[in-house]
Regions:
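Active-site His/Glu-centered metal-binding helix of metallohydrolases
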Residues: 4
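Active-site helix of classical SDR
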Residues: 1
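C-terminal substrate-binding subdomain of Rossmann-fold SDR/epimerase-dehydratase oxidoreductases
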Residues: 52, 57-165
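NAD(P)-dependent short-chain dehydrogenase/reductase
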Residues: 7-65, 70-75, 107-108
């Protein structure tokens, strides 16, 4: 697991002097050559463009979660590498904290009234939470990614791949 990997890094730092840091990324969204469609933003865009109802856990509609633009993830990695800042600390890397309802509303500005299929099954993570990137922001890194722009780019890409206009 991710936490086990963090413990391993701390142990290697103690035992062998490994210089490291940990980036805890929000849920990634955005276009890339190897896009994945199992997380909320990309999955909902895919479903909406191809005329499928968005599958939403009813209990998750208003839960807040941390999201991260792919470009922001890369810029954070480069930020740390360029500064050689391997201080063993944990850094949350987040573009924005949003609800599923927020994401659906943004998709709705590009695709009129996407259908929603509410799922009443229990989800693995029932928690609603926000994550702060303050620790890395005070060092000078800022998220610049835009969920709105990323949704527009994802929808445009999927439409070119054969989705509905």
């Amino acid at each position: 697991s991710k936490l086990e990997a963090e413990r391993l890094l701390r142990g290697l730092a103690r035992e062998r002097g490994l210089r490291h840091l940990v980036c805890r990324f929000g849920t990634i969204f955005g276009t890339s050559p190897g896009m994945r469609f199992h997380t909320a933003v990309n999955k909902f865009c895919w479903q909406a463009v191809f005329g499928q109802p968005l599958t939403v856990w009813r209990t998750a509609l208003h839960q807040r979660r941390p999201y991260l633009d792919l470009a922001d993830a890369l810029s954070a990695i480069f930020f740390f590498i360029r500064r050689g800042r391997f201080d063993g600390r944990i850094y949350n890397i987040v573009s924005r904290n949003l609800t599923v309802a927020d994401i659906i509303a943004m998709i709705g500005t590009h695709i009129t009234a996407p259908a929603i299929d509410y799922v009443d099954n229990e989800i693995m993570n029932q928690l609603s939470y926000e994550v702060s990137s303050r620790r890395v922001q005070v060092l000078g890194w800022q998220a610049t990614g835009s969920l709105e722009n990323s949704i527009a780019a994802t929808i445009a890409l999927l439409r070119r791949a054969g989705g509905r206009p």
